[in-house]
Amino acid sequence: ALDNQRCLIGGDIQTYDKDEVGYARTGAFTDLSQRDDFTNCGALFIGDVVGDDLSLYPDTRELTGMLNSPARFLPGNHDLDFDADAEHKFDTYRQEFGPAYHSYDVGNAHIISLESVEYPVDGEQYNGAIDDDQMAWLRADIERTPEDKVIVLASHIPLFSFSDSGSGRHQ
């Protein structure tokens, strides 16, 4: 493992239509495709893969084929199945990308990707939270992680925010 490994972590690709997929292709992804400094670690995109139109998943995921590394994902609030209940809120996401939360080892790092979107809350709203099942999984995952690994926690909605500390949202 490298002492100076570099990982690409990006958020909010958030394409709303095929034109925006094209802008992402000719912009950020073309720029990233010319870099190789993160190839030993890969890329992690931390939510809002698309901007509510889940039919754009294949087009947006195809962009990551331009990278010189593997790409992994976690969901954000714009990746929701808005017509689903809480249990099925990320069914389409899971069909396209796999589990909504997961972990993996790369070099000196153990990277934990969390699903931090609670939906629905009060009708059609969302909140930032981690449910009890995921918290139990997280504890077990950390317990299994060798002590010499650097642990990186990634989530779409921040796990703690000073700006929302007095409210019930994003807690």
Question: What role is predicted for each listed range?
Answer:
Residues 160-162:
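Sequence/structural signature of outer-membrane beta-barrel proteins
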Residues 1-58:
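N-terminal active-site segment of His-dependent metallophosphoesterases
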Residues 9-11, 42-48, 71-77, 152-156, ...:
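Active-site neighborhood of phospho(di)ester-bond hydrolases with catalytic His/Asp-centered motifs
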Residues 4-17, 108-120, 152-156:
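Active-site-proximal beta-strand elements of phosphoester/diester hydrolases
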